[in-house]
Amino acid sequence: PLGVYGRTKLEGENAVAASGCRHLIFRTSWLYSNTGKNFFLTMADLTASKPEIKVVADQAGTPTYAYDLAYLITYIIEENLLDRSGVYNYSGEGVCSWFDFASEINSHMGHTCRIVPCRSEEYPTPAERPHYSVLDKSKVKRDFGIEIPYWRHSLAMAVQEYISLIK
């Protein structure tokens, strides 16, 4: 882990594992939904109200729609797959940059904002962010026999849901 946030999350995972109890820990990335505070909602608002915005283009990852993660957890419970234990990575399929994600949000929302790519150095944040944070999801797919939605498909669903909520 790059910073305190990542290290403390890892320490928490290690403490749960050391307890000896069965556990399922899901690591995810770029989590978004139609509620709360997240990149999706920020971009939906900014692209609706600004003619141009800058978005980081040199960090790669995979957006995760909270609905998809909740669906996985519900599936595990309903199918009684609770005999497994461990840490699992879960995010949407595919890879994109924040710039790509923002551009797709802008497009799906029907907004005309001009999105300009920039480097991480041009957009300082309190915590250092990795340039590549794509998760290996082979274990979760294998152990639970699932297919993971492509991030663009999940985004399209999220936008439809968002539009229905704001009407």
Model-predicted regions and their roles:
Residues 34-35, 59-70, 90-108, 157:
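Substrate-binding strand-loop-helix patch
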Residues 151-167:
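Amphipathic terminal alpha-helices
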Residues 25, 61-63, 95, 117, ...:
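Short aromatic/basic micro-patch
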Residues 79-126, 166-167:
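Mid/C-terminal beta-alpha module of Rossmann-like enzyme folds, strongest
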